[in-house]
């Protein structure tokens, strides 16, 4: 499961945005290991959104998943990578008070690009908004 190695530990009312880093493969192809995230804390969550939440059993651990649907008791969240696990199929619905915010932007750090073509490719793909994907939500719900 992608856990977040950093959290901007600020109060929601003071700073509504924070940065985080993805570790793990569960959100591939949407997010990859090493991606940096811009998170909007306290934002309204809709089905299909990529969200940051506290793990239901280890609340000091932050994870990033896709919100599939709101059920009784909280959000049903799933990983985009069905082989990685670590989502609601393992721990059930996630209470709404454990959902911290929505991922608004994904940016990739400048890696070891060795050719001019690789550098140009990085420039055009380094920062992208993470949009709500309702089709992914329906597709994941069918799993």
Sequence positions of predicted segments:
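Extended hydrophobic leader/signal-anchor segments used for secretion and membrane insertion
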Residues: 1-143
């Amino acid at each position: 499961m992608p856990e977040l190695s950093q959290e901007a530990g600020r109060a929601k009312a003071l700073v509504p945005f924070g940065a985080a880093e993805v570790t793990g493969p569960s959100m591939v192809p949407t997010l990859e290991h090493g991606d940096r995230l811009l998170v909007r804390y306290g934002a309204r969550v809709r089905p299909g959104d990529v969200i940051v939440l506290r793990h239901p059993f280890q609340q000091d651990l932050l994870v990033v998943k896709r919100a599939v649907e709101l059920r009784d008791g909280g959000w049903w969240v799933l990983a985009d990578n069905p082989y990685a696990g670590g989502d609601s199929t393992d721990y059930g619905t996630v209470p709404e008070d454990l959902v911290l915010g929505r991922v608004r932007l994904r940016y990739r750090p400048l890696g070891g690009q060795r050719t001019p073509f690789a550098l140009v490719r990085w420039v055009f793909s380094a920062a992208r908004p993470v949009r709500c994907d309702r089709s992914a939500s329906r597709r994941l719900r069918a799993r």
